[in-house]
């Protein structure tokens, strides 16, 4: 009998380890396609905190089918048939096994359902970020957001919370497609002083969703989902992949989607008085973002403006900035001079793409 008890305990331990074990991609039931039973529902409201498999709920949480009608608005789910809506002070939580001291990025889809200034609080203790989702970057109303954290223990409680207090308790954001990816921050090499200059290391990109992933401003993100880089602006930048967009080099790149309000930067070690060359690619993502574009690149106090005539069908050009370092640390930064909209829907923000950014020392001419 004692041996049987030991076997049962071992089986239970094995079950919980498998249940919480992390792999890059969607979290268990991260797309919410496994839903609650009818007995756990009151209309669209979920009344049992453990009714949605793999998730723990708190507050007014709704289970929304694609095509659900809210007033005059039809709610569309970006992928699959279901999503969840978080009412006032509502949250969803899932525990995942991680490696203490390692970095991870979280990706999720979110959409506003009301006109209020909606926000989301994403957290893995002790880290958290309040993400404004008022600005809609795509015509579908759904945007993919990313956030990153450093694991403080071997388990992480991922919480997505709606901190809003609205007159209508059901007036909250829709959430879908929650995924996670382990990050491996790159180091400078003898071929590039910049870290992650090709943007190959970044958040998880959901397959079959062609909107790209928004990386929020650094002011609300202690650990960047784009290792090595900071988003030093009021608006997000967009992380794009070669499966859905035209990318100058490799499989990933960054699209500057909000003019001068959308900038990426990195601080690098330099030797005062030494000459350096900053080289990079400027192009378009083949997403109908056509017109005259200008990317402004900065290296310390030096700058260059790179014009690019986009036909919205892909393509790029190389450019470079030669400068002499004036301090032991130099800030490299990029932003777009102008705002742009896709010419096929006139409501999706877009902009020039930057990629393959390199910084090397050079001899003076």
UniProtKB/Swiss-Prot annotation:
Cell compartment(s), UniProt: Secreted, Cell wall
Glycosylation sites: 48, 121, 208
Pfam families in the record: DUF642
Domain of life: Eukaryota
The keyword Signal is assigned to this record: yes
Phenotype seen when the gene is deleted: Decreased PME3 activity in leaves associated with empty short siliques missing seeds or with heterogeneous seeds, as well as several morphological and developmental defects, such as abnormal carpel morphology, decreased stigma size, septum with engrossed regions and badly differentiated ovules tissues. Misshapen embryos with modified methyl esterification status of homogalacturonans in seeds and associated with abnormal radical and embryo bending.
Cleavable signal peptide: 1-21
Any single Gene Ontology cellular-component annotation: plant-type cell wall
Main location (coarse class): secreted
Tissue specificity annotation: Mainly expressed in vascular tissues of roots, leaves, stamens and petals.
Function statement: Together with At5g11420, acts as a positive regulator of PME3 activity during several developmental processes, including reproductive organ development, hypocotyls elongation, seed germination and endosperm (testa) rupture at the micropyle, probably by modulating the pectin methylation status in cell walls. Involved in the regulation of pectin methylation degree to modulate cell wall physiology during cell separation, hypocotyl growth and embryo development.
Quaternary structure and interacting proteins, as annotated: Interacts with PME3.
Descriptive protein name: Protein BIIDXI
Originating species: Arabidopsis thaliana
């Amino acid at each position: 009998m004692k041996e049987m008890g030991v076997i049962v305990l071992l089986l239970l331990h094995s079950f919980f380890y498998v249940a919480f074990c992390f792999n890059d991609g969607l979290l268990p039931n991260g797309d919410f396609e496994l839903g609650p039973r009818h007995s756990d529902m009151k209309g669209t409201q979920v009344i049992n905190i453990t009714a949605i498999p793999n998730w723990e709920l708190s507050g007014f949480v709704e289970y929304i089918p694609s095509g659900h009608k809210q007033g005059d608005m039809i709610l569309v789910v970006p992928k699959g048939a279901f999503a969840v809506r978080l009412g006032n002070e509502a949250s969803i939580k899932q525990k995942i096994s991680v490696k203490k001291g390692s970095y991870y990025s979280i990706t999720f889809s979110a959409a506003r359902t009301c006109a209020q200034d909606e926000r989301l609080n994403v957290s893995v203790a002790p880290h958290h970020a309040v993400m404004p989702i008022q600005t809609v970057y795509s015509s579908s109303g759904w945007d993919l957001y990313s956030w990153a954290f450093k694991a403080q223990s071997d388990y992480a409680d991922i919480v997505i919370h709606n901190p809003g207090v609205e007159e209508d308790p059901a007036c909250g954001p829709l959430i879908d497609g929650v995924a996670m990816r382990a990050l491996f921050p790159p180091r400078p090499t003898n071929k590039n002083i910049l870290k992650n200059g090709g943007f190959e290391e970044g958040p998880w990109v959901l397959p079959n969703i062609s909107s790209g992933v928004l990386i929020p401003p650094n002011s609300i993100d202690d650990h960047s989902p784009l290792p090595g880089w900071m988003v030093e602006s009021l608006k997000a930048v967009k992380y794009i992949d070669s499966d859905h967009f035209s990318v100058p080099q490799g499989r990933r790149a960054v699209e500057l989607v909000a003019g001068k309000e959308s900038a990426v930067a990195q601080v690098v070690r330099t030797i005062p008085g030494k000459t350096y060359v900053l080289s990079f690619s400027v192009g378009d993502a083949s997403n109908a973002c056509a017109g005259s574009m200008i990317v402004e690149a900065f290296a310390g106090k030096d700058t260059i403006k790179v014009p690019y005539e986009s036909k919205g069908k892909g393509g790029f050009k190389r450019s470079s900035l030669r400068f002499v370092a004036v301090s032991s640390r130099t800030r490299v930064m990029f932003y777009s001079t102008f705002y742009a909209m896709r010419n096929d829907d006139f409501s999706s923000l877009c902009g020039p793409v930057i990629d393959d950014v390199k910084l090397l020392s050079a001899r003076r001419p």
